[in-house]
A protein has these predicted regions:
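Membrane-embedded alpha-helical bundles of multi-pass transporters/translocases
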Residues: 1-226, 230, 273, 282, ...
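Intrinsic disorder in cytosolic terminal tails and internal cytosolic loops
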Residues: 166, 199-405, 411-510
C-alpha cells in the first residue's frame, strides 16, 4: 500500500525492535507494584487493545500518518508482550510450587508434556487462518479478477502469478487485514480468560514456600538427613509464626496518610520507611496463618479424617484397591458444597475416589490384580554399572588417543573393538534403566492410593517430633554460625590472595 519508503521502513524496524528492552525493564516494577496476576491481566488486556486499534487506523487514517500510528500500536504491543519474558519463568515456578503444595508432588516434567500438547494444537489450527484468507479473496481467482486493475494502478509486475499481488488492491487488502486482526484479537481474548482465575498472590506464594520448607524439615528429619542450615531457618519460621499468632494487622491507610502529611524530605523518608515496615508486618501475619495452619493440619477435623482414611487404606494394603467400589466416586461428587469446609471435604473425597478408580484399572490391566512392590534399589545398581562403564569408555578413549599419537595400529584396532563392546554394554544398561523406569511408573500408578496413604501417615508421625527438632536448635544454630564464619574467613583469604597476586604481577610489570 506504499505506506512508507525504504528508509522509513528501516527506521521503523529499528524503533520497533527496541520495544522489548523497555518491556523487560518495566516488568519487575509492575510486578512489585501490582503483583504478577494483575500484571498478567493488564498486559494481555492491553495486547487486545493495541492489536484491535490497528484495524481502524489502517482503514481510516490518512496515508501520511498511518504507518506511524501503526508503529505506535505495534511498539506498545511489543512492549507489553516483552513482560512475558520476565513473567513466564516466574509464573511457571510459582505454579510448580503451588502444585507441590496441594499435591505433595513436584511435576516439573509434566510442563514439557503440556508444551507438546500446545504444539499439536497449534499444528491442528494452523490451517484455519489460510482457509479464511482464501474465503475473503486471497486466492488465484481473485488475483485474475483484479489483475488488470492492479497492473493499471501499479504498472508491470515482476511476477503476475504471485497471489500476494491481490494486496495491492486496497479493498481486498483491508478485508484480509481485517481477518488477521480479528483472529489476533480473538486469540488474545482467549489467552486472557484463564488469568481471571489466577488467584495466587505474592503473599500466598511466600507462604507456600515456607510451608514447603516446613514439610521438608520434618521429612528430612525422619530420613536422618536434616542440615543445620535448614533446621535453623525453618525453626525460625515456626517461631516467628507463633509470635504473630495473635497479632493484628496495622492500618496501612494511616501510614499512607502520614506520608502525605509529612512536611519535609526527612519526615517523608521516615514515614515511607514506617509504611513499608507496616506492609511487611501485615504480610508476615498472613504468612504466619498459613504456617500455623500447616503445623496444626493433622489436628483439624479434616486432617483427622484424612488420617483415618490413610490408616484404613494402609492396613488393607493393595486389597483396598482391588475391592474399591467405583460407585464411591459418584457418591463423592454428590457431597454438598454449601460451605468452604464442605467444598474442601468434597474435593478431597473426589480426588481420593479418582485415585482408587484409576489405580484399580491399572492394577487389573497391568498386574492382573496382583501388585508386586517395585524394588527401587535396582536403580542404584544400574546407575553404578552405567557410571563404571562410562568411566571405562573414557579411559579407553584416553588410551586410543595415545595409541593414535604413537601410530600403534594394533593397539588402535584393539581399543576400538574394546570401546565398541563397552558401548554395547552401556546400551544394554540404558535399556534396563528405561525398562525399570517404566515398571516403577506402572507400580506407582497402580499402588498410588496405598503409597499416598503410607506417606501421609509417615508425615503425620514426623509432625509429632517438633519438640525433638526444637531441642536441636541451639546446637545446630551454633554449628551453622560457625560454618558461616569459616566460609567468610575463607572467602576473605581467597580474595586477599587474589589481590596480592594481582599486586605482584603489577609490580613485576613495572
Amino acid at each position: 500500500q506504499h505506506a512508507c519508503t525504504a528508509g522509513q521502513y528501516a527506521l521503523i524496524t529499528t524503533v520497533y525492535g527496541n520495544a522489548s528492552l523497555w518491556g523487560m525493564l518495566l516488568a519487575p516494577l509492575s510486578i512489585k507494584k501490582i503483583g504478577k496476576g494483575k500484571t498478567l491481566l493488564l498486559i494481555n488486556t492491553l495486547n487486545i487493545v493495541f492489536i484491535g486499534a490497528i484495524y481502524p487506523i489502517v482503514k481510516y487514517a490518512d496515508m501520511s500518518i498511518m504507518i506511524w500510528l501503526v508503529l505506535i500500536c505495534l511498539w506498545m504491543n511489543a512492549l507489553v508482550g516483552a513482560f512475558g519474558h520476565i513473567l513466564s519463568p516466574s509464573i511457571n515456578g510459582d505454579i510448580r510450587d503451588y502444585q507441590q503444595y496441594v499435591s505433595g508432588e513436584r511435576i516439573d516434567g509434566m510442563f514439557a508434556a503440556v508444551g507438546l500438547i500446545g504444539s499439536v494444537v497449534t499444528m491442528a489450527t494452523s490451517s484455519v487462518l489460510p482457509a479464511i484468507y482464501e474465503k475473503v479473496g486471497f486466492n488465484e481467482e481473485k488475483l485474475q479478477e483484479l489483475l488488470p486493475l492492479i497492473i493499471a494502478q501499479e504498472g508491470p509486475l515482476d511476477d503476475p502469478t504471485n497471489v500476494y499481488n491481490v494486496l495491492y488492491h486496497k479493498e481486498t487488502f483491508i478485508a484480509i487485514f481485517g481477518v488477521l486482526i480479528a483472529a489476533s484479537v480473538v486469540g488474545a481474548a482467549m489467552n486472557v480468560i484463564p488469568y481471571f482465575f489466577y488467584d495466587l498472590t505474592e503473599v500466598k506464594q511466600q507462604g507456600i514456600i515456607k510451608v514447603l520448607k516446613i514439610r521438608a524439615l520434618f521429612e528430612d528429619y525422619g530420613n536422618g538427613i536434616l542440615k543445620d542450615s535448614d533446621l535453623v531457618e525453618t525453626i525460625d519460621i515456626i517461631k516467628q509464626a507463633k509470635a504473630l499468632e495473635c497479632a493484628q494487622p496495622k492500618d496501612i491507610k494511616a501510614y499512607k496518610l502520614a506520608i502525605k502529611q509529612a512536611k519535609d524530605k526527612e519526615s517523608k523518608k521516615v514515614a515511607k520507611k514506617e509504611y513499608n515496615a507496616a506492609k511487611q508486618y501485615n504480610v508476615d501475619i498472613e504468612i504466619s496463618k498459613m504456617v500455623l495452619e500447616e503445623m496444626a493440619r493433622f489436628d483439624t477435623t479434616f486432617g483427622k479424617i484424612q488420617l483415618d482414611q490413610a490408616r484404613k487404606t494402609a492396613s488393607l494394603g493393595y486389597d483396598a484397591i482391588y475391592n474399591f467400589d467405583s460407585s464411591e466416586l459418584a457418591n463423592a461428587k454428590a457431597l454438598p458444597t454449601g460451605t468452604p469446609e464442605e467444598k474442601v471435604f468434597r474435593k478431597n473425597a473426589v480426588s481420593v475416589a479418582k485415585d482408587f478408580v484409576y489405580a484399580q484399572k491399572v492394577a487389573k490391566k497391568k498386574f492382573n490384580n496382583n501388585i508386586i512392590e517395585f524394588d527401587s534399589s535396582i536403580f542404584d545398581k544400574l546407575f553404578n554399572r552405567e557410571d563404571d562403564i562410562s568411566a571405562k569408555i573414557e579411559e579407553a578413549y584416553a588410551r586410543l588417543y595415545k595409541a593414535n599419537d604413537e601410530k600403534d595400529n594394533d593397539a588402535i584396532a584393539h581399543i576400538k573393538a574394546e570401546i565398541k563392546e563397552l558401548k554395547k554394554e552401556r546400551s544394554i544398561i540404558e535399556k534396563e534403566i528405561k525398562n525399570a523406569t517404566t515398571e516403577n511408573s506402572l507400580y506407582a500408578r497402580a499402588a498410588r492410593p496405598v503409597i499416598k496413604a503410607q506417606k501421609l501417615l509417615i508425615q503425620a508421625e514426623n509432625y509429632t517430633k517438633l519438640e525433638e527438632i526444637e531441642s536441636l536448635y541451639e546446637e545446630a544454630k551454633a554449628r551453622h554460625e560457625q560454618t558461616m564464619e569459616d566460609a567468610r574467613i575463607e572467602a576473605e583469604r581467597v580474595e586477599a590472595e587474589k589481590k596480592a597476586h594481582a599486586a605482584k604481577i603489577r609490580a613485576e610489570k613495572a
